[in-house]
Amino acid sequence: MKHMIQPFGIDMYTKVLTDTKSSKHMSFYEADKSGMPDNFTISFIPSYTTEWIICYNDDNDKAEFICAGSQNKLTELSLNVFDHYFGVRFDNTGCYFNKGCNSKTYPVNIADNVFRYEPATDSYEMQLIKDFHKSLTFKDRVALFKAFATDCKTFCPVSESIKKLNSLIYSGAGTVSELSAESGYSVRHISRLYNKVYGIGAKDFIKMYRFQNVLAEIIANPDRDNSFFIEGTGYSDQAHFQREFKTFTGTTPKQYIKLIKNF
Protein backbone atom coordinates (compact mmCIF):
# COMPACT_ATOMS: atom_id res chain seq x y z
CA MET A 1 0.00 0.00 0.00
CA LYS A 2 1.34 3.41 -0.94
CA HIS A 3 0.40 6.48 1.08
CA MET A 4 0.54 9.97 -0.31
CA ILE A 5 2.41 12.60 1.66
CA GLN A 6 1.52 16.16 0.69
CA PRO A 7 0.28 19.30 2.48
CA PHE A 8 -3.38 18.34 2.62
CA GLY A 9 -3.03 14.60 2.90
CA ILE A 10 -0.75 13.98 5.84
CA ASP A 11 -3.68 12.81 7.96
CA MET A 12 -5.02 10.29 5.44
CA TYR A 13 -3.54 7.31 7.23
CA THR A 14 -5.74 6.32 10.19
CA LYS A 15 -2.85 5.71 12.60
CA VAL A 16 -1.18 9.07 11.98
CA LEU A 17 -1.29 11.88 14.54
CA THR A 18 -1.19 15.36 13.01
CA ASP A 19 -0.65 18.94 14.09
CA THR A 20 -1.20 21.63 11.47
CA LYS A 21 -2.00 24.47 13.88
CA SER A 22 0.80 24.99 16.42
CA SER A 23 3.35 26.42 13.99
CA LYS A 24 2.78 28.94 11.22
CA HIS A 25 5.20 27.42 8.73
CA MET A 26 5.27 23.73 9.69
CA SER A 27 2.82 20.82 9.78
CA PHE A 28 3.70 17.81 11.94
CA TYR A 29 2.66 14.17 11.82
CA GLU A 30 3.65 11.01 13.63
CA ALA A 31 3.14 7.28 13.18
CA ASP A 32 4.57 4.16 14.75
CA LYS A 33 5.55 0.77 13.42
CA SER A 34 2.43 -0.93 14.76
CA GLY A 35 0.30 1.13 12.40
CA MET A 36 2.45 0.57 9.35
CA PRO A 37 2.40 -2.22 6.76
CA ASP A 38 5.58 -4.13 5.92
CA ASN A 39 7.80 -2.63 3.22
CA PHE A 40 6.22 0.76 3.77
CA THR A 41 6.50 3.11 0.80
CA ILE A 42 5.40 6.72 0.71
CA SER A 43 4.82 8.80 -2.38
CA PHE A 44 5.63 12.50 -2.52
CA ILE A 45 3.16 14.29 -4.74
CA PRO A 46 4.91 17.09 -6.71
CA SER A 47 5.11 20.13 -4.46
CA TYR A 48 7.16 23.25 -3.79
CA THR A 49 7.57 22.38 -0.10
CA THR A 50 10.18 20.36 1.81
CA GLU A 51 9.77 17.42 4.17
CA TRP A 52 11.78 15.97 7.05
CA ILE A 53 11.11 12.49 8.42
CA ILE A 54 12.85 11.40 11.62
CA CYS A 55 12.90 7.62 12.11
CA TYR A 56 13.89 6.27 15.54
CA ASN A 57 13.53 3.38 17.99
CA ASP A 58 12.49 3.22 21.63
CA ASP A 59 15.29 1.17 23.17
CA ASN A 60 18.40 2.26 21.25
CA ASP A 61 19.94 5.26 19.50
CA LYS A 62 19.56 3.86 15.99
CA ALA A 63 17.91 6.56 13.90
CA GLU A 64 17.65 7.98 10.41
CA PHE A 65 16.97 11.53 9.26
CA ILE A 66 15.37 11.98 5.84
CA CYS A 67 15.25 15.38 4.14
CA ALA A 68 13.19 15.55 0.96
CA GLY A 69 13.43 18.75 -1.04
CA SER A 70 10.64 20.01 -3.26
CA GLN A 71 9.80 17.43 -5.91
CA ASN A 72 8.92 18.19 -9.53
CA LYS A 73 7.61 14.70 -10.21
CA LEU A 74 5.94 11.90 -8.27
CA THR A 75 8.65 10.41 -6.05
CA GLU A 76 8.50 7.16 -4.09
CA LEU A 77 10.50 6.51 -0.94
CA SER A 78 10.84 3.24 0.98
CA LEU A 79 11.14 3.64 4.74
CA ASN A 80 13.42 1.42 6.81
CA VAL A 81 11.79 -0.29 9.78
CA PHE A 82 11.82 1.79 12.98
CA ASP A 83 9.54 2.02 15.99
CA HIS A 84 8.51 5.60 15.23
CA TYR A 85 8.32 8.08 12.36
CA PHE A 86 8.09 11.81 13.12
CA GLY A 87 7.47 14.01 10.10
CA VAL A 88 7.58 17.73 9.41
CA ARG A 89 6.15 19.39 6.34
CA PHE A 90 7.51 22.92 5.80
CA ASP A 91 5.58 25.47 3.76
CA ASN A 92 7.00 27.39 0.81
CA THR A 93 8.24 30.44 2.75
CA GLY A 94 11.78 29.09 3.15
CA CYS A 95 13.97 26.24 4.37
CA TYR A 96 16.03 25.31 7.40
CA PHE A 97 19.72 24.71 6.75
CA ASN A 98 22.79 24.20 8.92
CA LYS A 99 23.96 27.01 11.17
CA GLY A 100 26.20 29.51 9.46
CA CYS A 101 24.78 29.06 5.97
CA ASN A 102 24.27 32.00 3.64
CA SER A 103 20.94 33.70 4.35
CA LYS A 104 20.13 33.57 0.64
CA THR A 105 20.24 29.78 0.56
CA TYR A 106 16.96 28.88 -1.12
CA PRO A 107 14.88 25.68 -1.46
CA VAL A 108 16.35 25.20 -4.96
CA ASN A 109 19.52 23.92 -3.25
CA ILE A 110 17.75 20.69 -2.27
CA ALA A 111 15.08 20.51 -4.99
CA ASP A 112 14.46 17.05 -6.45
CA ASN A 113 16.78 15.48 -3.88
CA VAL A 114 16.22 13.15 -0.93
CA PHE A 115 18.99 13.06 1.67
CA ARG A 116 19.22 10.22 4.21
CA TYR A 117 21.72 10.02 7.04
CA GLU A 118 22.26 8.51 10.47
CA PRO A 119 22.97 11.12 13.16
CA ALA A 120 26.52 11.26 14.53
CA THR A 121 27.01 10.40 18.21
CA ASP A 122 27.52 13.96 19.47
CA SER A 123 25.35 15.76 16.93
CA TYR A 124 22.35 18.00 17.55
CA GLU A 125 20.27 15.39 15.74
CA MET A 126 21.31 12.65 18.16
CA GLN A 127 20.44 14.90 21.09
CA LEU A 128 16.99 15.36 19.57
CA ILE A 129 16.58 11.57 19.38
CA LYS A 130 17.54 11.27 23.06
CA ASP A 131 15.04 14.00 23.91
CA PHE A 132 12.38 12.13 21.93
CA HIS A 133 13.12 9.05 24.05
CA LYS A 134 12.27 11.01 27.19
CA SER A 135 9.17 12.66 25.75
CA LEU A 136 5.70 11.46 26.68
CA THR A 137 3.41 12.89 24.00
CA PHE A 138 3.27 13.96 20.37
CA LYS A 139 2.83 17.52 21.61
CA ASP A 140 6.10 17.21 23.54
CA ARG A 141 7.94 16.05 20.44
CA VAL A 142 6.52 18.90 18.36
CA ALA A 143 7.86 21.36 20.94
CA LEU A 144 11.24 19.60 21.00
CA PHE A 145 11.54 19.74 17.22
CA LYS A 146 10.60 23.41 17.08
CA ALA A 147 13.30 24.17 19.66
CA PHE A 148 15.79 22.05 17.71
CA ALA A 149 15.04 23.92 14.47
CA THR A 150 15.33 27.30 16.19
CA ASP A 151 18.49 26.58 18.17
CA CYS A 152 20.43 24.29 15.82
CA LYS A 153 19.42 25.32 12.32
CA THR A 154 19.11 28.54 10.31
CA PHE A 155 15.84 29.49 8.64
CA CYS A 156 16.48 30.99 5.21
CA PRO A 157 13.37 32.76 3.89
CA VAL A 158 12.50 33.11 0.23
CA SER A 159 13.03 36.52 -1.37
CA GLU A 160 10.62 39.40 -0.83
CA SER A 161 9.81 39.37 -4.56
CA ILE A 162 8.72 35.74 -4.34
CA LYS A 163 6.62 36.46 -1.25
CA LYS A 164 4.85 39.21 -3.19
CA LEU A 165 4.25 36.97 -6.21
CA ASN A 166 3.03 34.06 -4.08
CA SER A 167 0.58 36.38 -2.37
CA LEU A 168 -0.85 37.35 -5.75
CA ILE A 169 -1.24 33.67 -6.66
CA TYR A 170 -3.06 33.00 -3.39
CA SER A 171 -5.33 35.95 -4.20
CA GLY A 172 -6.34 34.50 -7.55
CA ALA A 173 -3.66 35.12 -10.18
CA GLY A 174 -3.98 31.88 -12.15
CA THR A 175 -1.52 32.39 -14.99
CA VAL A 176 1.95 33.85 -15.38
CA SER A 177 0.47 36.57 -17.61
CA GLU A 178 -1.93 37.59 -14.84
CA LEU A 179 0.94 37.50 -12.37
CA SER A 180 2.94 39.79 -14.66
CA ALA A 181 0.07 42.25 -15.07
CA GLU A 182 -0.59 42.45 -11.33
CA SER A 183 3.03 42.59 -10.18
CA GLY A 184 4.55 44.78 -12.87
CA TYR A 185 7.31 42.22 -13.46
CA SER A 186 7.90 40.79 -16.92
CA VAL A 187 6.99 37.15 -17.59
CA ARG A 188 10.65 36.34 -18.15
CA HIS A 189 11.72 37.99 -14.89
CA ILE A 190 9.03 36.11 -12.95
CA SER A 191 10.23 32.79 -14.36
CA ARG A 192 13.82 33.64 -13.41
CA LEU A 193 12.75 34.49 -9.85
CA TYR A 194 10.90 31.19 -9.35
CA ASN A 195 13.68 29.12 -10.86
CA LYS A 196 16.24 30.87 -8.66
CA VAL A 197 14.28 30.19 -5.46
CA TYR A 198 12.38 26.93 -6.05
CA GLY A 199 14.03 25.39 -9.11
CA ILE A 200 10.74 25.47 -11.03
CA GLY A 201 9.09 28.06 -13.23
CA ALA A 202 6.14 30.17 -12.13
CA LYS A 203 3.82 28.16 -14.40
CA ASP A 204 4.70 24.93 -12.59
CA PHE A 205 4.38 26.62 -9.20
CA ILE A 206 0.86 27.74 -10.09
CA LYS A 207 0.01 24.22 -11.31
CA MET A 208 1.18 22.73 -8.02
CA TYR A 209 -0.73 25.31 -5.97
CA ARG A 210 -3.91 24.70 -7.97
CA PHE A 211 -3.59 20.94 -7.70
CA GLN A 212 -2.93 20.96 -3.95
CA ASN A 213 -6.07 23.04 -3.42
CA VAL A 214 -8.15 20.65 -5.51
CA LEU A 215 -6.68 17.71 -3.64
CA ALA A 216 -7.65 19.35 -0.34
CA GLU A 217 -11.24 19.58 -1.57
CA ILE A 218 -11.25 15.94 -2.66
CA ILE A 219 -9.97 14.75 0.72
CA ALA A 220 -12.54 16.91 2.53
CA ASN A 221 -15.45 15.93 0.25
CA PRO A 222 -14.67 12.59 -1.45
CA ASP A 223 -18.31 11.95 -2.40
CA ARG A 224 -18.57 15.03 -4.61
CA ASP A 225 -18.47 14.90 -8.41
CA ASN A 226 -15.25 15.91 -10.17
CA SER A 227 -16.96 18.97 -11.65
CA PHE A 228 -17.35 20.36 -8.12
CA PHE A 229 -13.62 20.14 -7.49
CA ILE A 230 -12.46 21.82 -10.69
CA GLU A 231 -15.03 24.61 -10.93
CA GLY A 232 -13.23 27.95 -11.05
CA THR A 233 -9.78 26.41 -10.58
CA GLY A 234 -8.36 26.98 -14.05
CA TYR A 235 -8.81 23.51 -15.53
CA SER A 236 -10.21 23.81 -19.04
CA ASP A 237 -12.28 20.63 -18.80
CA GLN A 238 -12.54 17.19 -17.18
CA ALA A 239 -9.93 15.71 -19.52
CA HIS A 240 -7.42 18.42 -18.54
CA PHE A 241 -8.06 17.70 -14.86
CA GLN A 242 -7.78 13.92 -15.35
CA ARG A 243 -4.45 14.25 -17.18
CA GLU A 244 -2.94 16.51 -14.53
CA PHE A 245 -4.24 14.32 -11.71
CA LYS A 246 -2.60 11.26 -13.27
CA THR A 247 0.68 13.15 -13.70
CA PHE A 248 0.74 14.35 -10.10
CA THR A 249 -0.43 11.22 -8.29
CA GLY A 250 0.14 8.33 -10.67
CA THR A 251 -3.52 7.38 -10.39
CA THR A 252 -6.99 8.60 -11.40
CA PRO A 253 -9.34 10.71 -9.25
CA LYS A 254 -11.69 7.73 -8.96
CA GLN A 255 -8.91 5.40 -7.78
CA TYR A 256 -7.55 8.04 -5.41
CA ILE A 257 -10.95 8.60 -3.80
CA LYS A 258 -11.38 4.85 -3.37
CA LEU A 259 -7.96 4.73 -1.71
CA ILE A 260 -8.67 7.45 0.85
CA LYS A 261 -12.11 6.00 1.63
CA ASN A 262 -10.45 2.70 2.54
CA PHE A 263 -8.17 4.28 5.14
Task: Show the residue positions of the predicted features.
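Residues within well-ordered alpha-helical secondary structure of globular protein domains
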Residues: 101, 196, 217-220, 247
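A secondary-structure capping/hinge motif
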Residues: 194-200, 244-256
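Conserved structured core elements
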Residues: 205-208, 239
